[in-house]
């Protein structure tokens, strides 16, 4: 069973005194956590890519956990591991285009990871680990 998270969006009109009063309703958005399968696929992918590219996870494992969860969510919702650390006007179009799908083009070409998922050994934030467990990811992201 997937856990649901709800967020409430409020809208407040800016009106002139002559404007008639309007009713605004609350909008509640539910968001399911990524599937266990996608979480495991993205966790394994991240570990393998670290080894292959001689990069390391961030010394703060919560950064790694949040990014992997974001990639898994995009894998479920968009069908591709679109970088979760960027803003997109049209996520579906970006996922199809592929430039920002993990590993993104800047990472593949220059070893530059905007998300801080894959860090070169000389990066001040690079840890010494290339592994993370599913339990670590769940623990860090459980209240998000």
Curated annotation (Swiss-Prot):
Keywords: 4Fe-4S, Chloroplast, Disulfide bond, Iron, Iron-sulfur, Metal-binding, Oxidoreductase, Plastid, Redox-active center, Transit peptide. Binds 1 [4Fe-4S] cluster. It is found in: Plastid, Chloroplast. The keyword Metal-binding applies. Transmembrane segments: none annotated. [4Fe-4S] cluster binds at residues 83, 102, 104, 113. GO terms for molecular function: 4 iron, 4 sulfur cluster binding; electron transfer activity; ferredoxin-thioredoxin reductase activity; metal ion binding; oxidoreductase activity, acting on iron-sulfur proteins as donors. Its EC number is 1.8.7.2. GO terms for cellular component: chloroplast. Belongs to the ferredoxin thioredoxin reductase beta subunit family. This is Ferredoxin-thioredoxin reductase catalytic chain, chloroplastic. It comes from Spinacia oleracea (Spinach).
């Amino acid at each position: 069973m997937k856990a649901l998270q709800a967020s409430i969006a409020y809208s407040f009109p800016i009106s002139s005194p002559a404007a008639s009063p309007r009713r605004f309703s609350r909008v509640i958005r539910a968001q399911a956590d990524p599937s266990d399968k996608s979480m495991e696929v993205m966790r394994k992918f991240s570990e393998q890519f670290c080894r292959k590219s001689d990069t390391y996870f961030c010394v703060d494992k919560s950064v790694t956990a949040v990014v992997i969860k974001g990639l898994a969510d995009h894998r479920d919702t968009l069908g591709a591991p679109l970088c979760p650390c960027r803003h997109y006007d049209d996520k579906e179009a970006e996922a199809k285009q592929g430039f920002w799908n993990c590993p993104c083009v800047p990472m593949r070409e220059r070893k530059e990871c905007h998300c801080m998922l894959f860090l070169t050994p000389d990066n001040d934030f690079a840890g010494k680990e290339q592994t993370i467990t599913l339990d670590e990811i769940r623990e860090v992201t459980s209240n998000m």
